[in-house]
Amino acid sequence: MLSIENEKRIEKWIEDHKEEFIADLSKIIAVPSVATPGVSEGEFPFGIESANVLAAAKEIVEGYGFPVKNLDNYCLVANVGEGEEKIGLFGHLDVVPCGNDWNYPPYQLTVDGDLLIGRGILDDKGPLWASIFAVRCLKDLDLMPKREIEIFMGGQEECGMNDLLHYIEVSEKLPDVSFTPDGNYPICHGEKGGLRFYLAIPCSDEKIVDFKGGTVKNVVADKAVATLKNVCAECL
């Protein structure tokens, strides 16, 4: 348990680094980072956008004094502290497509009162960056646990998680316990899975030519469009 004195030290550290946090996070938000599904041959397994955000994050995190490894443009790994046991901190830098009709520019961090707005601010660039700063705080204040902390920054969580599979394949030692800042409270112990399916139904109405909406499966559709024929405007 932290002492009251250390709690105050942490609060002061957070306040002193708030502007730096927002400035660095804005650089990450500014990088479009929609990953491609599957695994492509060559230098960029998840496309150039995913590789770009990994490169941007690596440069910034190395500036904090953390050694960072780029695992073949699948993900980044930063290791901090020492110990026989390892704590894994898992987040991702790829995002889902933006869609249309944003009230704010999606790839520009907007500060509106106490709100931070931008694509990935909640899933998962913002929480991941807050966690990185939390590790910085522990390190700067000499409050690190007697364990190594390994920060995983993924490049393809939204459409396959091949970044995590590659990490598992090439890692010499996996974490003993892990935490992922990729969800709202309350804390959950696990996720049973997700259901994605195709539904086909017969349609006897010849007026409907086409019906579609959305861009990818894991995003709420911003609009739906139907193409009709032989329908008068008054009937709609």
Predicted region positions:
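A structural signal for short hydrophobic beta-strand segments in well-ordered beta-sheet cores
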Residues: V68, L109-V111, L199
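Conserved beta-strand termini and adjacent loop/short-helix elements that scaffold enzyme active sites
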Residues: L71-N73, G154, F211
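Short coil/turn connectors at secondary-structure junctions
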Residues: G83-I87, D112-G113, P145-I149, K173-D176, ...
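Active-site metal-coordination/substrate-binding segment of hydrolases
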Residues: K86-M153, C159
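Midchain, well-structured core segments that form catalytic/ion-binding scaffolds
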Residues: E158, N162-L236
